[in-house]
Amino acid sequence: MALRRFLRTSPITSTAQPAPLYDNQDIQDIVGAYARPWQSRFGDITITTTSAPVWSGRYPSVAARNIIVNTILGAHLNAFSGGVIAQYRGLTWRDNIMSSLAPPSQNPPPPAWVPAENVQLDSDNYPQYALNLSKMWSVNLDVHIMTMWALSDYGPLYEISVPTAPMPAMTTAALMAYIGCSITQLAMTAYQYAGQLPQTAAATMTTTLRWLAAIWFGSLCGVVHRNHTVNGFYFDFGKPGFNPDHAVLKWNDGNRAAPPAAARFRVYRVRSPHWQQMTSEVAGAILAQSVTAVAGLTAMFNNRGLPVWAQNIPHFTGAAAGTRVSRTYNPVTMAAARHQNWQAAGLITAVKQAELDQQYTDYAQAIEVHLTAQLAANPVANGRMPIQPFLPADFAAAGGTNQVVADARLMFP
């Protein structure tokens, strides 16, 4: 396999907050077992909220530990962008084959280690990459996920794409094996696959996960459901009132969506802070990010709507033609659109729709109360931020939910 180049970027901390955003216990938490922090992120999305927005004191939201992990990785990945120099008994060298082996004129003191932020990372500058490709693959996955979170000041960015060609037979067969699995289980599967060994963009499993992410997105919008499936597949929200986070892949031999008139791909993120306590949103993003970690992004992101620190990053963001503007949505207005689409399709009655809307609003309100309390309990000045800072008005920010749902209709006509 030819050597592949990976470009990434690390997070930036709040300008009002003293760096770093973590403490020594956070570091111990992510290095407490083998292979950590690489390929351990899946354990952070196994928590089920069952509509109760609680977790732990140190990581008070579903997304909290991922945020901390991203910050730690980003702050200490200077070596990924500049190489590592080893020193022993008066000799210095790089990598396992001792490139640049030389005796220095004098033994220099160890350099001062300064955690960095907003660092551009390039695997071409990392001497271990070519020699340890299998080991670097899991690093690439986690750093890619870190980048998709680092480029956003709201929810993490993720890409959804749907081709004009029908779903391949091998993909259909592969998806059959996942019927009955929840979005969280499927995100874990995608994460483990993408980080185990070097994969290709055209591999059957990569294609399967790409379709799976698209089916999840269509189901989230309420456009894909049991009466309008993607080759028979859809996600069923079996407990929309009790646990809106619970969605399971199912199959139904009924009406199926036609291929889109043209290949579709868009970039999305959640606008409101609710995503930090929603297992389904975190899992859905990681599922889609596991695909782009292997296959690469279809196009660069447009600067519009992105924070200043995420603009004009080579190979990622810019204002040129062909870049994609990230579209945002609010989970509350998205749930209302989903219920409306169910009602229009005859899946539920108008009375049930109103009931589900109210239940989801209550669920979101509980999350708002919880996150607001956690923000107050963890002020920026403390130097450790286990949740992403937000403004009270952010909860009501609708974003472009209607436009996002319209995208889903074009993807799955």
From Swiss-Prot:
Its main location: virion. It comes from the Viruses. It is found in: Virion. GO terms for cellular component: viral intermediate capsid. Transmembrane segments: none annotated. Keywords: Capsid protein, Intermediate capsid protein, Virion. The keyword Nucleotide-binding does not apply. The keyword Protein transport does not apply. It holds the Pfam family Sigma_1_2. Interacts with capsid proteins VP3, VP4 and VP7. Located at the interface of the incomplete T=13 outer capsid and the pseudo T=2 inner capsid, 120 VP6 subunits clamp and stabilize the inner capsid shell. Belongs to the reoviridae clamp protein family. This is Clamp protein VP6. It comes from Aquareovirus G (isolate American grass carp/USA/PB01-155/-).
